[in-house]
Amino acid sequence: MASVGTLAFDEYGRPFLIIKDQDRKSRLMGLEALKSHIMAAKAVANTMRTSLGPNGLDKMMVDKDGDVTVTNDGATILSMMDVDHQIAKLMVELSKSQDDEIGDGTTGVVVLAGALLEEAEQLLDRGIHPIRIADGYEQAARIAIQHLDKISDNVLVDINNPEPLIQTAKTTLGSKVVNSCHRQMAEIAVNAVLTVADMERRDVDFELIKVEGKVGGRLEDTKLIKGVIVDKDFSHPQMPKEVLNAKIAILTCPFEPPKPKTKHKLDVTSVEDYKALQKYEKEKFEEMIAQIKETGANLAICQWGFDDEANHLLLQNGLPAVRWVGGPEIELIAIATGGRIVPRFSELTSEKLGFAGVVREISFGTTKDKMLVIEQCKNSRAVTIFIRGGNKMIIEEAKRSLHDALCVIRNLIRDNRVVYGGGAAEISCALAVSQEADKCPTLEQYAMRAFADALEVIPMALSENSGMNPIQTMTEVRARQVKESNPALGIDCLHKGSNDMQYQHVIETLIGKKQQISLATQMVRMILKIDDIRKPGESEE
């Protein structure tokens, strides 16, 4: 009892509790708590709303160290936002879970959750209980997800005909910084995924796709390399710049003479001793180099470094080498070349060598930067997307954009059903939910109508960001959908003169759209069930 507060009695002997540090705690209850939550969620959603769609604007995020990030990716914007409010933090988590699960649609899910809470606020003002609103939203989400199944189309996932996959990837990349060359980027992403995809298991191992970037050149110079790029060069400038039919020894053991395992000290008292030590080291290095060459290897890739003496001997013996290659790259090289990683020098045999058709060094512009490209590998299922760009920010944003595109293509390989974008799916779902709401005899029908109105916020935001009159555009498209019974009619964001998203090839994955609706609804349900907040005051913190 003492930890909570003290028990006291009034003049009539009735007990009451004096809560400890009550003056230093802040507390919100009931409707006031709900309104506080809704306001915080709306603030986050409104920030994200202008980033939605192909004409969405980018955000510049500056962190505490002064590093600048310019991005259009919802998950990145929210993860870099400095938010204090506990509900705003939940919105950040919501976007992250969409990113982890689907990879795309991170902005849309936050905008939808914000719209649902905004509608819930109006229902609360009308005196409807939050649990009834939450139940109505749950029913409406179920109807919307069932309706998405009905209006979905199947896309042919075929290695010989990648065009449908390219169109879907183009939709994802349309709102990104790379949209000036989004056809090329979409093709690169599709080719990368199809190269590493396991079509029998309908799965893609992203570990086999490496995305590298180098400042310089233009975005259009980005290319897909069927092999591995390592941000290293040959250890000696006089080594050959290209090795053909490379047999690669992949070493994770130190390339140096063996040392005693115990703590030891070496006393060198004369010049002869020093020369003897030098001779021993040289002989050991030559022995190691001979051992590598005996296996038939003509290239050594080491995780650790080696000194200049060893480097010079490697050059003299005509064995090109690369040093200080990181662990993940070593693994990728081993997968690509079909080689085995050698942790002990004594275990090196010819069976453990990797094979690559060509290993070459590439240099960039006038800088001294060099990279190694390992191509024509034994296992062609490891690929690298090599991005070029004018500055570091563009390259980082291009990496994020390509990540979204790769995720979307992977989702299509797993489940090849799609719905049409441009707000078409949301308008169609809103109409379906409204029709069901009319048949609902209970109080939940108000929440279901509110859910339908919230779904329409997505197409309205798209038209607003494209410089159109949102209400007029929205009502015209909705009326046409009802009249023509065509769920592919959406907002013509790119001003192509047609509202038919099937004709414009604006395609989104069904799995991503379903996830958006269910995640946003779960989040809103959780927020509506909170009616009391207690947190420490400033002095207690």
Curated annotation (Swiss-Prot):
The chain residues annotated with the modification N-acetylalanine are: A2
Chief subcellular location: cytoplasm
- Keyword Transferase belongs to the record: no
Q: Which domain of life is it from?
A: Eukaryota
**Which Gene3D superfamilies did the record assign?**
GroEL, GroEL-like equatorial domain, TCP-1-like chaperonin intermediate domain
Q: Which CDD domains match?
A: TCP1_epsilon
Q: Which Pfam families match?
A: Cpn60_TCP1 (PF00118)
> Could you say which residues bind ADP here?
G53, G105, T106, T107, S175, G422, D492, E508, K513
Positions annotated to bind Mg(2+): D104
Keywords of this protein's UniProt record, alphabetized?
A: Acetylation, ATP-binding, Chaperone, Cytoplasm, Cytoskeleton, Hydrolase, Isopeptide bond, Magnesium, Metal-binding, Nucleotide-binding, Phosphoprotein, Ubl conjugation
**Where is this chain's protein located in or outside the cell?**
Cytoplasm; Cytoplasm, Cytoskeleton, Microtubule organizing center, Centrosome
Q: Which PROSITE patterns match?
A: TCP1_1, TCP1_2, TCP1_3
GO BP annotation list: binding of sperm to zona pellucida; chaperone mediated protein folding independent of cofactor; chaperone-mediated protein folding; positive regulation of telomere maintenance via telomerase; protein folding; protein stabilization; response to virus
What's its EC? 3.6.1.-
Residues the record lists as Phosphoserine modifications: S26, S346, S539
Name the family the entry cites: Belongs to the TCP-1 chaperonin family.
Task performed by this protein: Component of the chaperonin-containing T-complex (TRiC), a molecular chaperone complex that assists the folding of actin, tubulin and other proteins upon ATP hydrolysis. The TRiC complex mediates the folding of WRAP53/TCAB1, thereby regulating telomere maintenance. As part of the TRiC complex may play a role in the assembly of BBSome, a complex involved in ciliogenesis regulating transports vesicles to the cilia.
Record text on subunit structure and interactions: Component of the chaperonin-containing T-complex (TRiC), a hexadecamer composed of two identical back-to-back stacked rings enclosing a protein folding chamber. Each ring is made up of eight different subunits: TCP1/CCT1, CCT2, CCT3, CCT4, CCT5, CCT6A/CCT6, CCT7, CCT8. Interacts with PACRG. Interacts with DNAAF4. Interacts with DLEC1. Interacts with SPMAP2.
Q: What is this protein called?
A: T-complex protein 1 subunit epsilon
Lineage of source species: Eukaryota, Metazoa, Chordata, Craniata, Vertebrata
